[in-house]
Structure formats: C-alpha cells, structure tokens
Amino acid sequence: MKNKNLILAVVALVIGALSATASRADDPDFLAFSTGWFDFNRKKDQGGELRLEYRLNKKLWEFKPFGTLAVVSNGMTFLGAGVLMDIYLGRRWVVTPSFAPTWWRGKTDDLDLGHGVEFRSQLEFAYRFDDRSRLGLSISHYSNAGLGDSNPGTESLMVNYSIPLGNFSKMFK
C-alpha cells in the first residue's frame, strides 16, 4: 500500500509540474501588498504589520529577487532584499518560499530582536487569478541567526495580494 501511495504522489507531482509550465512562463513582475499579525505566536509585543514588496520576474536558476519594506504598529521596521521561488501546483495554486536579510530597527521595552540584521524566511500559499494577480496567506519568521547576544525571533501571519505591474498601471489610466 505504501508503494502505491508513493507512486500516486510521484505521478501527481509530475502532472502538476507539467501543467504548471505554461503558468510559470508568463509571470510578470509583481507589487505585493500584505497585512497581518506581527508576533502572533509569542505575544511579547504583538501588533499589526504592513508590508510592501517588489517581486521581479528575473530569474537566476529558479530564484527571483525581491525587495521588501515592513512596518509594524509597535514602531518596528524591516527593510531588505532577498530571493524567492514560485512553485506552481497546477494553473491556480502557487507556493512561494522566500528568504531575505533585512535591516531592523525599533526595539521596544517588550521585544528586542537582538541585532540590527534580521533574516526573514517565509512560506506563502496563494491562489492565482486569470489576470495573474494572487491572493494568499503566508507565515514569516524573523531571526538574527545568532548574530546578537540574544535571538528571540518572532513570527508574522499575513494576508498577501500580489498584483502584476502591468495590471497596476492599467488602474490609473
């Protein structure tokens, strides 16, 4: 039974990968807007987080560069750039893991992330519309990876809307 399930899983992955080839080929640059809950898991200094990202469609292997700016209602800010990879599950669903070193500022009495450099790792799961815009959920982890004396880290839970830049410019015509 295990072998049968493994074979079915491999077949499903191959079919998904083949059907996603056309989807992968026509993706543009994106402007991504996100809002969500900062420090939702540890609850040391919770707040609302707003994020803006510019996601380029230029690829190095399967990796795409992006820039990010996040502001939190507790006064923290994160500015950085990193890489992401879009993994297509058929025509409509996209899983996007990403990684970005960021410059952090805004220590509060309740939460000190321990160093000015914070690394953000994120996993996003999104639905892709006909116009190629995406609506998704993501979970992010911020950590200084041991660069500071302390490394408390924190997580964010976000709702993301990514709009192709071509669609964005059409809104203002």
Cite the ranges covered by each PLM segment:
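Outer-membrane beta-barrel initiation region
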Residues: S23-L56, N167-M171
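Transmembrane beta-strand segments that form the barrel wall of outer-membrane beta-barrel proteins
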Residues: D29-D39, E62-S73, P97-W103, L137-S143
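Repeated loop/turn-to-beta-strand initiation elements of outer-membrane beta-barrel proteins
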Residues: D29-L31, K59-K64, R91-V95, D131-L137, ...
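Membrane-embedded beta-strands of outer-membrane beta-barrel proteins
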Residues: L50-Y54, A81-V83, L123, V159-Y161
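Solvent-exposed loop/turn segments connecting transmembrane beta-strands
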Residues: F38-G48, L69-G80, L89-R91, D110, ...
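Residue-level signature of outer-membrane beta-barrel architecture
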Residues: Y54-K58, M85-I87, Y127, I163-L165
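Outer-membrane beta-barrel "beta-signal"
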Residues: G48, P152-K173
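Cleavable N-terminal export/targeting peptides
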Residues: M1-D27, G166-K173
